[in-house]
Amino acid sequence: MKKTLQYISIGLIFLISCQDKTGFSGFQNGDIIFQTSKSGQSRAIQIATGSNYSHMGIVYKQENEFFVYEAVQPVKLTPLNDWINRGKNAHYVVKRIKNSEKLLTPEALTKMKQVGEKYAGKDYDLYFEWSDSRIYCSELVWKIYKEAVGLEIGELEELSDFNLTNETVKQKLMERYGDNIPKEELVISPESMFNSDKLITIFEN
């Protein structure tokens, strides 16, 4: 009896400790996760786009562990707990496409991973160009869902649509582009995807 209670106690401690790392135990393949990055450009992205969040990725489960497929340097899979802890205050929001039980079939998820594979190892796109040679976080998620599932999550905008007058933003633009800011460049922002009516919020810690 004592041994049984000990095993139960150990099991409970293990479950609690696992949940404490993420704060959420209901992740599913294909979930989209958002956070505020602590990178040097994060504040500029937030101001320019009017967003609380500056980084995002797609959640996948592999061998009973969850990972985030993300565009950093380079594009790669990152263990979920590491990804969460890397964000500001370990805060994150999980969103899921509507009707995911119908749209995210095993075949669709396989296609998403296949599409994502062609970006694996590519450099992070500091210039936010709409090309496949380099790629940034929201562009990666948008293109995977577009090509694999046929969903356009969020509205494409031009760089000129954002708030480019703030001093923090202007400084970052000068660092990247000098006097040749590509104001007509197509961009998909984390904010646009976060507010898409194709997504529902599953969890926020």
Specify the residue positions occupied by each region the protein language model found.
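Cysteine-nucleophile amide-bond enzymes
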Residues: 18-205
